[in-house]
């Protein structure tokens, strides 16, 4: 990978995590006129490493960052003042993803930045309260969205704690399949066999834990009224470039689950004809859906 080109408008901050037992870094963007505003809404953008949404050279397709997308929309009047948070939810070298889990076996890897492996508790108990305190963030106006594994984590976060968010978005999310009507994880899902998930899921896989700590089973266990209150925004790439170029089938699966729960997709189009699994397309998704998040956030301001 090329040398990261971190957007200078992204402020690095350190979060001392009681859950992880270490200090973790994240990036935060605060609009220049924040001091003129009341408490601002927050969008948490997830992927893996904290740099990914704000790195101009994250992949060769990219021509900007999430901040470029936001500031263009703000100048057009499509969104209002908004804090964006880019947390690190993987090892410091981005080789070991957490899946927004409290890892089963963090001792299996020597990668830096994992600590106890309790990333789910870090996100909910350490990071989010710290952002609210430090940046005058609105305590109820929060959105969460992600790309790829970030989409999985955004859906899981909203399913586990729908009380914390107003909207949730996923672009080409690596949504895990469930079985038995959504009561259990589908243990034959090929994604689960990837060795990069050994720390998160254990070796052999801790299936009892996986059945519970799973985006779809969590969604189906959640309070129906609470998850229906959220605005759900789901997009993914086209079927033609499956399996390596998009997560079309996983996106379709998520929409079927949401439909069974009586939840409509707020995205204008679900399967994007040119929706490759790239950062260029992730930024395009953000440009199309950030005004939808803003509409949901504005209702609680």
Regions from the PLM with identified roles:
Residues 1-301:
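Non-catalytic cap/lid and distal C-terminal segments of serine-dependent acyl enzymes
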């Amino acid at each position: 990978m090329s040398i990261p080109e971190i957007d200078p408008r992204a402020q690095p901050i350190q979060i001392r995590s009681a859950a992880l037992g270490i200090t973790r870094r994240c990036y935060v963007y605060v609009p220049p006129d924040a001091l003129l505003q009341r408490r601002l809404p927050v969008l948490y953008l997830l992927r893996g490493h904290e740099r990914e949404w704000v790195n101009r050279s994250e992949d060769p397709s990219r021509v900007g960052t999430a901040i470029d997308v936001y500031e263009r929309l703000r100048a057009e009047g499509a969104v209002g003042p908004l804090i964006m948070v880019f947390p690190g939810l993987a090892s410091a070298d981005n080789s070991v993803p957490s899946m927004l889990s409290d890892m089963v076996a963090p001792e299996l890897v020597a990668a830096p930045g994992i600590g106890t492996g309790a990333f789910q508790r870090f996100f909910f108990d350490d990071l989010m309260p710290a952002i609210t305190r430090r940046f005058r963030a609105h305590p109820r106006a929060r959105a969460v969205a992600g790309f790829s594994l970030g989409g999985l984590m955004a859906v899981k976060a909203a399913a586990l704690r729908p009380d914390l968010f107003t909207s949730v978005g996923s672009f080409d999310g690596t949504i895990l399949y469930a079985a038995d009507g959504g009561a259990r994880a589908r243990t034959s899902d090929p994604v689960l066999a990837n060795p990069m998930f050994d720390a998160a899921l254990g070796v052999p896989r801790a299936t009892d834990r996986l059945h519970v700590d799973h985006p779809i089973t969590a969604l189906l266990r959640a309070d129906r009224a609470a998850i229906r209150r959220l605005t759900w925004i789901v997009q993914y790439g086209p079927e033609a470039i499956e399996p390596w170029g998009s997560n079309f089938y996983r996106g379709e699966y998520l929409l079927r689950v949401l439909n069974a729960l009586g939840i409509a997709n707020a995205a204008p189009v679900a399967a994007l004809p040119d929706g490759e699994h790239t950062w260029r397309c992730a930024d395009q998704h953000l440009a199309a859906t950030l005004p939808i998040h803003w509409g949901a956030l504005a209702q609680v301001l």
